[in-house]
Amino acid sequence: MNDTLAQLMEESIKQVWSQRNSVRRMVALEAIYAKDSTLFEVGEIITGYDAINDKVSRTVNGMPADFVFTRLKPVIINNNIGRLVWGLGPKDKPPVATGMDIAVFENGKIKSLYVFLDT
């Protein structure tokens, strides 16, 4: 089960947070996140597929076209909570920003995602 949850977190940064096509992103959101999932960023609480998709669109549209999110350390799962340390920057180059996602899982999907930005 831990491997499956870790894989969900990795798929989230690849198929949701690095996806610039909102239609493809929505398909990934529905597969990875619970229907009533909530995204927590500093100063923001965003709930539901449409609102999360809009937030990710604003995020990726503000990044250079060659930027992607990548996993920097192995995902750690502790019971029903996961941690993923990520980097953001040009593919195959050192990240220009780093952060961490904390996910709470419910029924095999991400129910809540807490995003922490380091730089």
Give residue spans per PLM region:
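Short acidic-aromatic low-complexity motifs
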Residues: 2-35
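A beta-strand edge to alpha-helix "cap/lid" segment located at domain peripheries
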Residues: 4, 57-119
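A near-ubiquitous, low-amplitude feature marking generic local secondary-structure context
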Residues: 12, 35, 39, 86, ...
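Short histidine/acidic/glycine/proline-rich micro-motifs that form metal-
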Residues: 15-19, 43-46, 90
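A solvent-exposed, acidic/Ser-Thr-rich amphipathic alpha-helical stretch
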Residues: 26-78
